[in-house]
UniProtKB/Swiss-Prot annotation:
The lineage of its organism: Eukaryota, Fungi, Dikarya, Ascomycota, Taphrinomycotina. The keyword NADP does not apply. It is a peripheral membrane protein. Residues 10-199 form the CP-type G domain. This is Mitochondrial GTPase 1. Mitochondrial GTPase involved in assembly of the large ribosomal subunit. Plays a role in expression of the mitochondrial translational machinery. The keyword Mitochondrion applies. It is found in: Mitochondrion inner membrane. Belongs to the TRAFAC class YlqF/YawG GTPase family. MTG1 subfamily.
Length: 328
């Protein structure tokens, strides 16, 4: 199955395993549009029995009422999200005790303030007891908004300018970043990290979702294939979501042709270039042009299926580690 796990991701995982200590806090940023598939089993072992906050970022692209970024409506949406999905999540999580869930839109200060308060609670207790340094590691898949969340936290806490580089394509942060102070007068620091993709894709549909939300670099899958999947999902929701581009259709070629003609995004000589227009449609999706919706099915059955796959993967990895040790 298609995945994207370049060397720097493997190195990051190893460096994190070596550097995260018992007192540190893990902030795992996931994409609210794929709350289930952006779980990364590779991070489960890293965060096991440590204080962890799971942040569902980009709620504005997942929940309709957060779309206009109006403060109260965005917050209500986050609350609704927690009440419905997070309950389901908590029921199925394997290590429940140490983690909390927060939904965010990285440029809505109220969402960030809630996260900041939670981090204050989690880090101050250790800091007060010993005055030792506490690190907050911001981890997650590529392009989920780790750097944006970090910048927003630092701005809300210290009114400081941006420290982490933000980019619209995945793989912008390539190294475990320098530590930056989070709270005035406290030895509490944040660490930005490169996005880590799942070493193994659990379900074929996940790869298409990662490409769609841009967690995976464009070009790993054909853009037209990804748009075909988007079209399928839009048709399930309501074909009126794309009337500005095309009349209702199940056929991706017709859709792309109509979209190219409607938008004037044509290739050389005024012909339709499927890849060009598909790439444009993907950009539109990523800005919320088709509305806000969650791509993962949150049915209990899906959760069970997913957890079974994750458990199998963990067992397979354990067996591999055992046999390597025996050989050595
Ligand atoms: N709509 C929306 N976009 C966001 C949000 N947070 C971040 N973004 C955008 O998502 C893109 C990626 O943000 P980054 O903060 O660079 O993501 P990252 O996880 O640090 O990325 P890598 O370094 O590639 O792993 C940027 O274009 C941001 O502007 C959000 O809450 N909503």
């Amino acid at each position: 199955m298609t995945t994207w796990f370049p060397g720097h991701m493997k190195t990051t995982l190893k460096r994190l395993r070596d550097s995260v200590s018992k007192n540190d806090v893990i902030v795992e940023v996931r994409d609210a549009r794929i709350p289930l598939s952006s779980r990364n089993p590779a991070l489960e072992t890293l965060a096991a029995n440590r204080k962890r906050v799971v942040v569902y970022n980009k709620c504005d692209l997942a929940f309709p009422s957060a779309g206009d970024l109006c403060k109260t409506r965005a917050l209500n949406s986050v609350r609704a999200f927690e009440e419905t999905y997070v309950e389901t999540l908590a029921r199925w999580e394997t290590i429940q005790t140490l983690r909390r869930y927060v939904g965010t839109v990285s440029n809505v200060p109220e969402c960030i303030k809630r996260l900041l308060q939670l981090l204050q609670k989690l880090t101050y207790s250790d800091h007060a007891a010993s005055n030792r340094t506490v690190k907050v590691f911001v981890v997650g898949m590529p392009n989920v908004g780790k750097s944006s969340v970090m910048n927003a936290l630092r701005h809300a806490s210290l009114h400081r300018r941006k420290v982490a580089v933000v980019g619209s394509h995945p793989g912008v942060t390539r190294n475990v970043g320098e530590v930056v102070r989070l709270f005035e007068g406290k030895n509490v620091y944040m660490v930005d990290t490169p996005g880590i993709m799942l070493p193994t894709i659990l379900q074929p549909e996940d790869a298409i979702k990662f490409a769609l939300v841009h967690a995976m670099k464009d070009g790993r899958l054909h853009n037209a294939v990804v748009v075909d999947y988007l079209l399928y999902r839009l048709n399930l929701i309501d074909p009126n979501t794309y009337t500005r581009l095309s009349s209702p259709t199940n056929d991706v070629s017709t859709f792309l042709h109509n979209a190219a003609v409607h938008t004037g995004k044509l290739g050389k000589g005024g012909t339709v270039n499927d890849d060009l227009i598909a790439s444009y449609v993907l950009q539109l999706y990523r800005t919320g042009f088709f509305g806000a919706f969650v791509l993962d099915s949150m049915e209990e059955e899906q959760w069970q299926q997913r957890l079974a796959l994750e458990k199998n993967l963990v067992r397979r990895n354990q067996r591999r580690v055992c046999s390597t040790r025996k050989k050595a």
